[in-house]
Amino acid sequence: MYPCERVGLSFTETAPYLFRNTVDLAITPEQLFEVLADPQAWPRWATVITKVTWTSPEPFGAGTTRIVEMRGGIVGDEEFISWEPFTRMAFRFNECSTRAVGAFAEDYRVQAIPGGCRLTWTMAQKLAGPARPALFVFRPLLNLALRRFLRNLRRYTDARFAAAQQS
């Protein structure tokens, strides 16, 4: 594992590469946080993720840690830098299995709306070394993938909570 810059919340506004997308979900903010805390749920909607392992006990909060394994053998050692139940959570990579990641953070902001909630997801990156120019080229494709993940999340939460309501 290679160290990443230990960025704060402001990185999700100032990073060299920012991706911000929004989805409206037909679930409550509480239900969304249930999904975001569920390690089995992440691979179901963010399909680049293969496994999530919480390395801190509940209750989760700022300072909580987890390991996220992704396709291509990439592993991120994450630390939550914000955990405001039902409104916001954000994490950064403290370490990554590739040297290409100089700094990485994600910010999930949740707003209650009529009939559910709105999730605004920001991914912030700073690449290192020769990987830097690659993201400039692949930026549109990455953003398409991120939007697809949010569509997946909507389908996943629709199915998960529709089944719960029928029980």
From Swiss-Prot:
CDD domains: PYR_PYL_RCAR_like. GO terms for cellular component: plasma membrane. InterPro entries: Polyketide_cyclase/dehydratase (IPR019587), START-like_dom_sf (IPR023393). SUPFAM superfamilies: Bet v1-like (SSF55961). It holds the Pfam family Polyketide_cyc2. It comes from the Bacteria. This is Uncharacterized protein Rv2574. It comes from Mycobacterium tuberculosis (strain ATCC 25618 / H37Rv).
